[in-house]
Amino acid sequence: MATASSLFLASPVATAPTARARSTPSASPARPSLRLRRPSTLAAAAVQAEHQPAVAAAPKPPALPFRVGHGFDLHRLEPGLPLIIGGIDIPHDRGCDAHSDGDVLLHCVVDAILGALGLPDIGQIFPDSDPRWKGADSSVFMREAVKLMHEAGYELGNLDATLILQKPKISPFKETIRSNLCDLLGADPSVVNLKAKTHEKVDSLGENRSIAAHTVVLLMRK
């Protein structure tokens, strides 16, 4: 666990249910409605983060022109839980069993950015032993990682992410997920790529018992 107390936000992230925007349905074929997670408490959490930097005492990394980071995450899928991917509520009969909202895509993107900066991983900065992050919206973690990236003098060069899950099919939701990911990163869509793969019914991923994601990021000196 990171030792500096300033690694953490000042107060718990609220988890009360909030309204979610629905995507516009296509003409044909009919697709399940999507819900963009925008908690009403997110603005308050962002204000808290502004007043309490996450790694105030951490030295800036060497001024390399480029830095590369890799992120990986995996969560069990359990019946009756929400399935959140890239900040989007995906219709499914199973969801991620996790301390926060279990957003496997955002978690691995955060880890990739932190890794590129040479900082502790998401589990150290936002540990699952801390009740403040119980049910937390993962966009809070994303915004903090992006803030640290800019404070270190870097910007996103490009990002390539791969989701691995057997069900549901992600293709109907992929562009909505990618668009929200671009918004959280403050990045142009041309530098953010998202792919989805099944696991050919092999092991827990292929048996619809888990979901995983890999992400590689390239950061460029401003």
From Swiss-Prot:
Changing residue 117 to F: In 505ys; yellow-green leaf phenotype, delayed heading, and reduced seed-setting rate and grain weight. Homotrimer. Residues 1-43 form a transit peptide. Enzyme of the plastid non-mevalonate pathway for isoprenoid biosynthesis that converts 4-diphosphocytidyl-2C-methyl-D-erythritol 2-phosphate into 2C-methyl-D-erythritol 2,4-cyclodiphosphate and CMP. Is essential for chloroplast development. A divalent metal cation binds at residues 73, 75, 107. Its main location: plastid. This is 2-C-methyl-D-erythritol 2,4-cyclodiphosphate synthase, chloroplastic. Pfam families: YgbB. It comes from Oryza sativa subsp. japonica. The keyword Transit peptide applies. Substrate binds at residues 73-75, 99-100, 103-111, 121-123, 126-130, 165-171, 196-200. CDD domains: MECDP_synthase. NCBIfam families: ispF. Pathway: Isoprenoid biosynthesis; isopentenyl diphosphate biosynthesis via DXP pathway; isopentenyl diphosphate from 1-deoxy-D-xylulose 5-phosphate: step 4/6. GO terms for molecular function: 2-C-methyl-D-erythritol 2,4-cyclodiphosphate synthase activity; metal ion binding.
